[in-house]
């Protein structure tokens, strides 16, 4: 199976890329001109991804998220071949933590497939794919795990009906004040191999 990482943007891919709903291009103010920035997204392209396997990218960062209330992300999924993947067969996975193995929060969202060929923003960026997580809930997962007396070194899943389709998990002892790495990945939930591109 193959895994490719790339970029898609409004200037080079205007035939298939549109701004997410409600997003405007940033403007760079010069001394005599105003220039619009090139809005873009990272792409993860998986080919023949086996059942329950994950492919992901990560970035080392250093950020304190305590001053923020929400984490928002727009997600797009499209088949590499026509009718090659259906809604909810793939799940986007976002990990935030001190590291990616022992101390992290994990957010999962099942992906809806975008309407092929459409340039309507809500077709390209289905509302059901919007990740909108209240960061306070991530801290509450650790408390719920401790109350449940669950092992700290195992992935704990929060049972929360107010998170919609989001699945929130925690492992170890991450803290929002010391996020050192972030991961974005995709998992195949289908018994069949799947090929798709995720933005």
Predicted feature residues:
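Surface-exposed, low-hydrophobicity segments enriched in Gly/Pro/acidic/Ser residues
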Residues: 1-199
